[in-house]
Amino acid sequence: MSEQKIGKITQVIGPVVDVEFEPGQLPNILNACTVTNPGINDVPDNLVIEIAQHLGDNVCRCIAMDQTDGLVRGMVVRDTGLPITIPVGEGALGRIMNVVGRPVDGLGPIPAKTSMSIHRDAPLFTEQDTEVRVLETGIKVIDLLVPFPLGGKMGLFGGAGCGKTVIMMEMVNNIAMHHGGISVFCGVGERTREGNDLYNEMKESGVLPKAALVYGQMTEPPGARARVALTGLTAAEYFRDEEGQDVLFFVDNIFRFTQAGSEVSALLGRIPSAVGYQPTLATDLGALQERITSTNKGSITAVQCVYVPADDLTDPAPATTFAHLDGTVVLSRQISELGIYPAVDPLDSTSRILDPNVIGEEHYDVARGVQVSLQKYKDLQDIIAILGMDELSEEDQQLVSRARKIQRYLSQPFTVAEVFTGMPGKFVKVADTVQGFKEILEGKHDALNENSFYMVGSIDEAVAKDAASKA
C-alpha cells in the first residue's frame, strides 16, 4: 500500500469539513478519511469523513459521519485509501452496527472475517433473475390486492401516523419468523425508540441470530443518514452474492435518505431543484434502488417505508421512489380515521404481479371484484350523504352493504400491536383470504352484521363473532 495521505482541516461548516492535502496527494472522491474528534470521545480516529468534492488548491470537501462539534482548524486528517468499508457475513448477524460498520450494541467488536465497501455497482442485466414468485405476508389486504413478489421491491407509502412502521414490524414478525432465512433491517433517520423496540422484539422471538441491524437514526448527522441505507444494503448483498441466500431487506425510511441528501446538498454548494430537493435526487435514489435486486445467485426481497410529506404523493421524493418499485401499498388517512387498520387504500395500492398468470384466475377475479365493489360504494357515498340509504335502489343497497362488510373485513389485528389493542394478532393464509372475500362477494354472509367482520382473521371468525353477538 502506498504512503498514507495526510491533510489538515481548514474549515468546518456543520457536517461539512474542508481538508487541505499536500500537492499531488489528494485522495479519491468517496474515500473515507479519519480524524480524532475529542467532542465524541478519546478514541483515536473516532470520526469518519467521506470525500465529496475536490475544490481546487489541494482542498477536499468532506461529509462527516458523526458530530463535528469539537473539530478545530489544523487538526490532522488521515486518508484510509478506501471507501467506507463494513464487516459483513456471519459475524454481523445478531448485532447492531452504525453507518461505518462499528458496533453500537455494547457487545464488543464485530468478529467478521470479510469486509466490503458500501459503494458498489448494481448487478449487470445478464445477472438479474426474472422468475416471479409470490411471498405470503399473512396480511389479508396485502395478500389479496397487493401481492408481494419474492425477490421484488415493495413500498409502504403514507403520511405521518398512518401506520407504516407498524405494518413493517408485522411483516418482520410474519415473514422473518416464518421464512427462516437471513433478514437485514436498516433504520434510516427514524425514531431510536422504534429501533430499540425492534431489537428487543427480535431478541425475544429468537430471530436475532439470523438478522443484521444497521441504524442511522434521527439523532445522526445528515452524512450518516445519507449513507446508512448503503451500509444496510451492502450487508444484504454479501448474503445474496457470496452465500447465495434469499435475503429479506427492510428499510424504514427511504424518504429520510432523500431528506439527508437534500440537507447535505446545499452545504456542498449545489443549487436546489424542485421543492428544495437536491438536483441529484433521481441519481442518488437510482444508485441505491438499482442495487436492490435479485440475481441468479440469490434474491433480495425489499420492503421499504416511504414517508409522504403532507400526504402529497406528487412530492418529488415519493414520486421518484414510485418508479423503482414492483408494488406500492398506499396508506390513507381517511381509512385510518374510520378506525380500519391496516389503513391500506385498496383502490390506490398496486402490484405488478396482480396478474391471473401469476396468482391464478380465482384470486385475480376476487381481487378485482373487491376493487369494483369498493369503487362503486365510493361513487355512491355522496348520494348516501345527501339522501340517505333508503333512496338507493335495492341492488345498490345490497352492493353498499357488501362493500361495507368488505371494508371492515380488510382490517386485521396485528401481533406487534397486541400490547395496544389487547387483541391477539392473526396470520391469514392466502387461500383463506381469497375464500373469505369470495363468499362476501357472492352474498353468502348478507345476513351477518357488518361489525362482525371488523378486526377478525379468517371468515369463520366473523361468523362465530356474529353468532356470539346474537346469542
Swiss-Prot record:
Catalytic activity: ATP + H2O + 4 H(+)(in) = ADP + phosphate + 5 H(+)(out)
Sorted UniProt keywords: ATP synthesis, ATP-binding, Cell inner membrane, Cell membrane, CF(1), Hydrogen ion transport, Ion transport, Membrane, Nucleotide-binding, Translocase, Transport
GO MF terms held by the record: ATP binding; ATP hydrolysis activity; proton-transporting ATP synthase activity, rotational mechanism
Listed PROSITE patterns: ATPASE_ALPHA_BETA (PS00152)
EC number(s) recorded for this UniProt protein: 7.1.2.2
Main location: membrane
EC class (word): translocase
Keyword Membrane: yes
Binding locations of ATP: G158, G159, A160, G161, C162, G163, K164, T165
Stretches that traverse the bilayer: none
Bilayer topology: Peripheral membrane protein
GO cellular component term of the entry, any: proton-transporting ATP synthase complex
Cell location: Cell inner membrane
Highest taxon, organism lineage: Bacteria
Pfam families: ATP-synt_ab, ATP-synt_ab_N, ATP-synt_VA_C
Subunit structure: F-type ATPases have 2 components, CF(1) - the catalytic core - and CF(0) - the membrane proton channel. CF(1) has five subunits: alpha(3), beta(3), gamma(1), delta(1), epsilon(1). CF(0) has three main subunits: a(1), b(2) and c(9-12). The alpha and beta chains form an alternating ring which encloses part of the gamma chain. CF(1) is attached to CF(0) by a central stalk formed by the gamma and epsilon chains, while a peripheral stalk is formed by the delta and b chains.
HAMAP family: ATP_synth_beta_bact
Similarity field: Belongs to the ATPase alpha/beta chains family.
Function text: Produces ATP from ADP in the presence of a proton gradient across the membrane. The catalytic sites are hosted primarily by the beta subunits.
Protein name: ATP synthase subunit beta
